[in-house]
Amino acid sequence: MGFLGVYSAVYDYVPAGEGELTIKEGDILYVLEKSTEDDWWKAKKKASAEDEDEPVGLIPNNYIQEAAPSGKARALYDYTRQTDEELSFTEDAQLEVFDTSDPDWILVGFEGEYGFVPANYIELSEEEQHKEAPAPSLPSRPRPASVPVEEEAPAAPQSPLSPQPAETPVATPAAAIAGILKQRQASAPAARAPPEFTPEASDEEPPTPTLPARPVSQVSVPQPTRGQEHDREREPARRYSPRLPASPVVTASPPHNRVSFSTMGVVNDVDEHKAARAPGGFHMYNISEMVHVMGKKKKMPTTLGINIATGTILIAPEQARDGPEQTWTAEKMTHYSLEGKHVFMELVRPSKSIDFHAGAKDTATEIVSALGELAGAARAEGLREVIAAGSGSGQKRGQVLYDFVAQGDDEVDVNVGDEVVIIDDVKSEEWWMVRRVKNAKEGVVPSSYIEIMGAIQSASSAGINAGRSTVEQNRLEEARLAREALKTAKKDEVEVGPGMRLPERGSSLFARDNGNQSGEQKRRESVRESGQSRSSKSKPDPAKVRTWTDRSKSFSVEAQFLALKDGKINLHKMNGVKIAVPVVKMSVEDLEYVERMTGISLDEDKPLSDIKKQQKSRAAERDSSNGASPAPGPSASMGAGASIQTPEYDWFQFFLSCDVNVGLCERYAQAFKRDSMDESVLPDIDATVLRNLGIREGDIIKIIRFLDKKYMRKDGKRNVSFGGEDEGEAGLFSGPGGALKNNTRKGRPAPAVQTNDVVDANAFSQNGTEKSSPQGVATPLANAPTPAEKDVKREGFDDDAWDVKPSKQETTSSPPAQSIPAAAPQQPVITGSMQELSLLSTPLEPVKAQPTAQASPQPQAPPAVTPSIFAGIGNQQTGVPQPQPLPSGPLLPANLARQRPAPPQMTANSTLIPPLPPSRPLSAPQAASAYAPPPLQAQATGYGAFQPQIAPPGQSLHDLNQQRMQQQQQQQMQQQQFMLQQQQQAGMMQQPTGFNQFNPGVPNNFQQFPMQTGNPQQPFIPNQTGTPFANPPAQPFQPQPLQAQPTGFQSAFPPGQQYPQPTGVNSYLPPALQPQPTGMMNGANGFNQNFTPPPIPPMPQQQPAPMLPQATGPAPPVRFGVNGTNNIAPQPTGRRANLAQATPQNPFGF
């Protein structure tokens, strides 16, 4: 359907949102959609002359009104719309005309629909023609001689008064076409041109002369006059110098490829151009030229003039702004064709591809007829043929010496080494007309750039053109080029020439994807180049051409064999195309031909059936040559001249008989048929062939089993194996007959039997004639019990684990025969020197000592745990055992004997803590000293045995801890007394040295002296750590201070109390030794040398801290009814939280 309505804008509207359309008062709008929900309609605005686009958007429906029709029209023919914007109608239909601004497409309405219709399909009413005639924008047209041109001059100043200056020349073609149609209907068939478009000769201007040759003396182009405008060649100055010309440069104006004369000062208007071309001989046609603007095809009013007498073609746009007029001679037209209302022309020098829209098919036919007469007269085929025959000379062939870049429309680009044909070298000595052989382009180039290579022989004197006239040769050549161009056009989807669609009306709703004029020109040139390149392809040698056929016998081609490369056969076809065909696709005959030509064997690429047939045929030929009659069979008639078509073997039935799945039978059958296999190859089929054909492994076993059974094949090579190895009669998983083995049964291996290991020397005796008597000495093997015979066949498992077997004691109960070996024969005794030389003496053997078997100690089982053990643990005493007293007196190094320390004694009253390790033995490396080192204190490492500590009845763990601490204090006092006694016996007193740098604090009962050399030490307090038993902290013991014996100066101060030093490790390890400076202080305090230092107080000696028991193990049981300290209370577990009774103090509600 077309438009829903044609409306005109009543008010101006500026868009307020996206998607809306700007309209002004008086704009013509085409309504596309009418909304039923709101007052916004979708419309398209008619494009003005300045704005070629037709925007689409939303407009308010109260800003527009329906446009009134401007006239009526009657349909001359039936028409069916081609696009959505067009309108269909029938013959004699009455149409309402709304817009006639486009000369070819009229906006009309018919039966409530609106759209565009072709102008030549309708006839406007008299009112419409009368209304359009006096329009002020009517452009000038060629008129009879009685109407002077000067009378139209006053119309020029009136054109600015028009509200639409750009539409001034638009209505003229429509009015002219309407007049032409009216005259054709009222009168007889029209003449060559309508009277309106055939102006008479002007009295002021002479007839248009023919195109003169370029004069040598002319250097520049003078200011053109009316009588000389059509004679301009625009290139004389360039013909005599390779440099840029002094004349104006002819520039191309995209996209219409029109020349511009702004540099020449040409300001002549359209009227002057028309007046210059009006004189007799010219047939004028007011048509439209299809040009491309912004990617769209538009129609540009143009005047086409054809002068058959002078052989001139004139093209002049209606408006001067579209470009000046251009002229070509007849020989510059290389192509013309007709397609409906379109006329296509190809012109050179300057090159231009033109698409004219004649408006009517009759007009287009008339134009093409005139162009045909013009081309025939320009070619003068008969006259040229007579002249060529009389002169006996042809065109010259030349080669380009230098690169030349065209600087004008009549020149052509050439490169060094290009081959050219010299068309004209007579008109000018410095500029020659040539045709480039590479792309068939013609133009002028400097003659100094070309070197003549010789003459070109005429094509009509030899070859297929011999005896044909030039006209017939040209006709054949044109027909061939037309066919090639048509093929290329179909291939490249280029709609040029026959079959081209009519150009549709340019619209924003209908996008066109055709190329522009320059693109069409390039495509046409490429078509010509491709046609020439195809014709210039090399052809194969006819003597070596043969027919090649593929393996399926479906395709064949005549070509020449070139080479065999990369598994492909290179062929040269008759049309010059070179192809490469895989070897596997060629027939056997072709492969044999290639083998004969190259000497390379191609048996791997041949079908297996053909190879078998060839082998059998060769064997039959050998048999026949030897006089033996060939065996009857399919190969007996291989050498016969006539072949008998035998029916194909039914492979489908064959695979069915092999128990192959029905769905796979057809696929396997096709594979065998593709390989051209028949029943003759069945005896030779093996697993490898089947795998190559794509048969599955399971089906391969079935097929091989069927063939073995059918042809009674017993060879190992017929069996199917895995990994390419033959298994002989039986395979790994199948038996001799092809049946699958049951490998799930596995028997018990036979037991090893021990034989006699005594070598019988009689077996090596030389008496070979004597045979051992059957009564021999019984061997242990003979006396061994014979195992029970097993059944050959068993049902179920072959394992005999359930069989009754003799006990092993029976076999070992008969060793007498084995312990009595046979008496060895006595060897002759060799004495004397013979014994020394003899090799028969037995070598000496060392006597091996029998190792004594040591009885391994039997591991004693740990005693059973009974309640009495736990009862006895509570009576044990805790504490550290007393160290062993050392021998008194000084111990010299000579008295340091290697002694093993005595193991600790375990008594019934020992503590729960494991006994401490013994003191370090004196055999260990010691410092060499004349005095005995202090005894090493035993250090307990690790933790005690994991035994629960159970308090006896009536006591708690707190009581036990207090008793333990008292025992430890007593033991510590005993150790200190022992140390004092040892020091007195040794004759030396230990002197504490060094400073305590870890604890600078001083106890309250210590009196500091001025020259104290060591800081007192605090008492060592063991670390108090928390235990899971919630034991109260143990009270630190208070050791008795040692009485230090000062040396040197006698001090009147009482000795300081010694305090143990904490080390920060744990209570089990002694503190680390600190380096202590010794010696006297020199006079560092600044006093004179006779200063007597005060006495040095004794240095306290650090003693090892006693060990404290650490409670380990599980918590002790809770005993009720015992008074004393608070014992550990059992903690209830496993209860469930009761949130209903939860309080801040008891959040879980227990």
UniProtKB/Swiss-Prot annotation:
<dbReference type="GO" id="GO:0030674">
    <property type="term" value="F:protein-macromolecule adaptor activity"/>
</dbReference>
<dbReference type="Pfam" id="PF24081">
    <property type="entry name" value="PH_SLA1"/>
</dbReference>
<feature type="region of interest" description="Disordered">
    <location>
        <begin position="1101"/>
        <end position="1150"/>
    </location>
</feature>
<dbReference type="Pfam" id="PF14604">
    <property type="entry name" value="SH3_9"/>
</dbReference>
<dbReference type="InterPro" id="IPR001452">
    <property type="entry name" value="SH3_domain"/>
</dbReference>
<dbReference type="GO" id="GO:0030479">
    <property type="term" value="C:actin cortical patch"/>
</dbReference>
<dbReference type="InterPro" id="IPR056996">
    <property type="entry name" value="PH_SLA1"/>
</dbReference>
<dbReference type="InterPro" id="IPR013761">
    <property type="entry name" value="SAM/pointed_sf"/>
</dbReference>
<dbReference type="GO" id="GO:0043130">
    <property type="term" value="F:ubiquitin binding"/>
</dbReference>
<feature type="compositionally biased region" description="Basic and acidic residues">
    <location>
        <begin position="538"/>
        <end position="547"/>
    </location>
</feature>
<feature type="compositionally biased region" description="Low complexity">
    <location>
        <begin position="813"/>
        <end position="827"/>
    </location>
</feature>
<feature type="compositionally biased region" description="Low complexity">
    <location>
        <begin position="143"/>
        <end position="170"/>
    </location>
</feature>
<dbReference type="Pfam" id="PF08226">
    <property type="entry name" value="DUF1720"/>
</dbReference>
<dbReference type="GO" id="GO:0003779">
    <property type="term" value="F:actin binding"/>
</dbReference>
<feature type="region of interest" description="Disordered">
    <location>
        <begin position="722"/>
        <end position="827"/>
    </location>
</feature>
<dbReference type="InterPro" id="IPR035821">
    <property type="entry name" value="Sla1_SH3_3"/>
</dbReference>
<feature type="compositionally biased region" description="Polar residues">
    <location>
        <begin position="753"/>
        <end position="776"/>
    </location>
</feature>
<keyword id="KW-0728">SH3 domain</keyword>
<feature type="compositionally biased region" description="Low complexity">
    <location>
        <begin position="849"/>
        <end position="858"/>
    </location>
</feature>
<feature type="compositionally biased region" description="Polar residues">
    <location>
        <begin position="217"/>
        <end position="226"/>
    </location>
</feature>
<keyword id="KW-0254">Endocytosis</keyword>
<dbReference type="InterPro" id="IPR035800">
    <property type="entry name" value="Sla1_SH3_1"/>
</dbReference>
<feature type="region of interest" description="Disordered">
    <location>
        <begin position="846"/>
        <end position="930"/>
    </location>
</feature>
<feature type="region of interest" description="Disordered">
    <location>
        <begin position="127"/>
        <end position="170"/>
    </location>
</feature>
<feature type="region of interest" description="Disordered">
    <location>
        <begin position="605"/>
        <end position="640"/>
    </location>
</feature>
<feature type="compositionally biased region" description="Polar residues">
    <location>
        <begin position="1140"/>
        <end position="1150"/>
    </location>
</feature>
<dbReference type="GO" id="GO:0030833">
    <property type="term" value="P:regulation of actin filament polymerization"/>
</dbReference>
<feature type="compositionally biased region" description="Low complexity">
    <location>
        <begin position="625"/>
        <end position="640"/>
    </location>
</feature>
<feature type="region of interest" description="Disordered">
    <location>
        <begin position="183"/>
        <end position="257"/>
    </location>
</feature>
<comment type="subunit">
    <text>Component of the PAN1 actin cytoskeleton-regulatory complex.</text>
</comment>
<feature type="domain" description="SH3 3">
    <location>
        <begin position="393"/>
        <end position="455"/>
    </location>
</feature>
<dbReference type="GO" id="GO:0006897">
    <property type="term" value="P:endocytosis"/>
</dbReference>
<dbReference type="GO" id="GO:0005634">
    <property type="term" value="C:nucleus"/>
</dbReference>
<keyword id="KW-0963">Cytoplasm</keyword>
<dbReference type="InterPro" id="IPR013182">
    <property type="entry name" value="DUF1720"/>
</dbReference>
<feature type="compositionally biased region" description="Pro residues">
    <location>
        <begin position="1030"/>
        <end position="1039"/>
    </location>
</feature>
<protein>
    <recommendedName>
        <fullName>Actin cytoskeleton-regulatory complex protein sla1</fullName>
    </recommendedName>
</protein>
<keyword id="KW-1003">Cell membrane</keyword>
<dbReference type="Pfam" id="PF03983">
    <property type="entry name" value="SHD1"/>
</dbReference>
<dbReference type="GO" id="GO:0005886">
    <property type="term" value="C:plasma membrane"/>
</dbReference>
<feature type="compositionally biased region" description="Low complexity">
    <location>
        <begin position="183"/>
        <end position="195"/>
    </location>
</feature>
<feature type="region of interest" description="Disordered">
    <location>
        <begin position="1026"/>
        <end position="1060"/>
    </location>
</feature>
